[in-house]
């Protein structure tokens, strides 16, 4: 198998450009809720022209952080508001739901995209709040589909998430695995110590971005099934 980083260090650091005012803008929600014993990530993906903006937040378990002793300054990032450290046996799905509810007061969340794993727990809670939830049955299957766009967004400097070292870390922890049959998979460089939740949440949102975040209204209406 061929392996490589999903983006160069220079490309990742270029994403740290300040995000513009996106008040009331339409966006796609992304969610990675699979690892409720360590990290969970949520986010909103916006588009303006060729540029995409990713506003994200994470939740991490206090007990996990104490035992894992990760190298990055997680507590410092928490102080900056990039993530919330919770003291509970597993990450309560209501943290995720409440975050999207709060964001809905500021932005127009068209849809929330997540993988099927553990979605049975959180989907009813999101739908009870009136959110439209789309599930991805096999996340790795969409990686190959999105790989050309992901590569282009990084290479052409069209993706931004503001000054967010946590998101940088997530992205540095991803490697692009190309299988013998040419399929692309975004995998963790280390299964236990290299978290990728924020990146995977963004990939989930990107899956629906071309359908929802478009300037071509006629095309969008054609795609809808009333």
Where are these regions (language model features)?
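Metal-dependent DNA phosphodiester-chemistry modules and their immediately adjacent helices/loops
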Residues: 125-215
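Short His-Asn-centered micro-motif
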Residues: 33, 114-117, 136
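Acidic two-metal-ion nuclease catalytic site recognized across multiple nuclease folds
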Residues: 3, 7-10, 206-226
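Flexible loop/turn segments at secondary-structure boundaries
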Residues: 2-3, 35-40, 50-52, 62-66, ...
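Short glycine-rich phosphate-binding loop at a beta-alpha junction
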Residues: 106-118, 123
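Gly/Thr-rich phosphate-binding beta-strand-loop-beta motif of the actin/hexokinase/Hsp70
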Residues: 22-54
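Nucleic-acid-processing active sites and adjacent nucleic-acid-binding tracks
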Residues: 46-111
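ATPase catalytic-site recognition across NTP-hydrolyzing enzymes
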Residues: 1-29
